């Protein structure tokens, strides 16, 4: 049950999951239609939360969460007019298309994003934008600017950089690393100051 080409098949899957539970049919239908989806930013956030709890448990200084963690983002789902818009096509973006639809994925690919800073948060943002396919169409682009150079102390928290990148431009190095992750991404890098504090 890896793809759901018709409304009928996702309805059947929703009924199969329901069993004897008292669950809203809309919730089950949303689950059945999107359970094959994969969203890199959500996986990164959940993975980060899980890793933090493991460190708490192993370190013994802080108490980890000792309960189920439930994450619900149904409000982010678009209304479903057609299942055809959410069919898998064998693309690297199928995990996103299954959840949000082909039209949304096309808008992501045509987006033009200006990102100030290629530090810790900038590296994470660039990775997420590349995984989502932002700036992959001829009209789309990611522009990243950062005046800084990579220092050895950056390597532990800015994961796009390696030891041999020390002394290099953060913007250029981050752009190269992102293009290795997703060669279709159009990235321009600048080394200009944006504001008084940037």
Model-inferred region functions:
Residues 1-3, 7-198:
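Adenine nucleotide-associated cytosolic modules
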């Amino acid at each position: 049950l890896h793809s759901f080409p018709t409304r009928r098949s996702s309805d059947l899957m929703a009924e199969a999951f329901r069993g004897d539970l008292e669950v809203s049919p809309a919730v089950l239908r949303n689950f059945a239609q999107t359970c094959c989806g994969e969203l890199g930013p959500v996986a990164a956030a959940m993975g980060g939360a899980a890793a933090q709890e493991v460190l708490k448990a192993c370190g013994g200084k802080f108490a980890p969460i000792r309960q189920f963690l439930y994450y619900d983002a149904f409000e982010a789902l678009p209304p479903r007019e057609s299942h055809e818009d959410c069919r898998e096509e064998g693309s690297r973006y199928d995990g996103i298309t299954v959840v949000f639809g082909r039209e949304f994925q096309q808008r992501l690919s045509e987006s033009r994003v200006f990102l100030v800073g290629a530090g810790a948060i900038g590296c994470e943002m660039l990775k997420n934008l590349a995984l989502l396919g932002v700036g992959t169409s001829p009209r789309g682009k990611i522009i990243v600017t950062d005046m800084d150079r990579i220092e050895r102390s950056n390597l532990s928290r800015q994961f796009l950089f390696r030891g041999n990148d020390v002394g290099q431009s953060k913007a250029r190095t981050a752009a190269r690393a992102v293009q290795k992750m997703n060669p279709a991404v159009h990235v321009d890098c600048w080394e200009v100051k944006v504001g008084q504090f940037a």
